[in-house]
């Protein structure tokens, strides 16, 4: 999927989407022009406030695009986006930083992005990730049948922590690998894992989202225990960064 293809085929979107959407953006790897075989196409659809029934109808109307083109649609009402904007939402910074506008009936969302304040919840996010790590640790001790899923969650945490660190360092990056690379470059030998180790871990996330085959030999209590320690160490670095920035 490419931006060019999306723009050329935009009118093939369901009529209800084109009628109700305030704006449609592509973001993520397609917008960055660094997609690969493991990438999907992320699309944001901003709509006016509507009933829950109408909102569900909008979401269900794109099922063929999701199935046939590996598209993932994020639908948001403007009232929700306005509340997110007040807090300087990471997601909205993601759109502002790299989103590409495909379709627009009103400039309301662009104006909202123009006034987007700085995000101040990074430390709170890191503390929440610490709680998730504790939950995973308890889960593994109680039931080792969820290791593959737990590893996929750890992959998301690894990525999100690195995204948060890049934000704190004033170098926003929402990619799959690039935030990790930047953190490795920043901390050097202090950083708990290598890019290749992270890529193997992230395969567990792709196994859930894209059906990618994984190395079953890695599905062990020892492997996840090792990653729990690595993510804890990464969080310690991230929290120390919060204290100096």
List each language-model region with its residue ranges.
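Short hydrophobic/aromatic beta-strand micro-patches
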Residues: 44-48
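Hydrophobic/anchoring residues in structured secondary elements
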Residues: 23-26
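Catalytic core of pol beta-like nucleotidyltransferases
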Residues: 1-16, 20, 31-37, 52-245
């Amino acid at each position: 999927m490419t931006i060019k293809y999306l723009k050329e085929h935009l009118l093939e979107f369901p009529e209800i989407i084109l009628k109700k959407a305030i704006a449609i953006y592509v973001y993520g790897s397609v917008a960055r022009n660094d997609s690969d075989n493991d990438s999907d196409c992320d699309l944001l659809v901003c709509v006016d406030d509507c009933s829950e029934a109408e909102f569900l109808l909008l979401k269900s109307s794109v099922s063929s695009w999701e199935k046939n083109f590996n598209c993932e649609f994020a639908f948001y009402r403007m009232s929700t986006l306005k509340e997110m904007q007040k807090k300087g939402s990471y997601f909205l910074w993601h759109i502002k930083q790299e989103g590409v506008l495909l379709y627009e009936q009103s400039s309301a969302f662009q104006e909202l992005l123009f006034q987007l304040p700085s995000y101040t919840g990074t430390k709170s996010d890191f503390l929440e990730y610490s709680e998730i790590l504790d939950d995973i640790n308890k889960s593994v001790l109680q039931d080792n049948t969820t290791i593959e899923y737990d590893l996929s969650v750890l992959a998301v945490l690894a990525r999100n922590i690195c995204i948060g660190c890049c934000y704190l360092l004033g170098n926003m990056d929402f990619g799959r690998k690039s935030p990790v690379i930047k953190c490795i470059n920043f901390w050097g030998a202090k950083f708990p894992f290598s890019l290749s180790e992270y890529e193997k871990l992230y395969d567990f996330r792709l196994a859930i989202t894209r059906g990618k085959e994984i190395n079953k030999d890695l599905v062990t209590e020892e492997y996840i225990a090792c990653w729990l320690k690595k993510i804890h160490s990464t969080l310690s670095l991230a929290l120390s960064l919060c204290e100096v920035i």
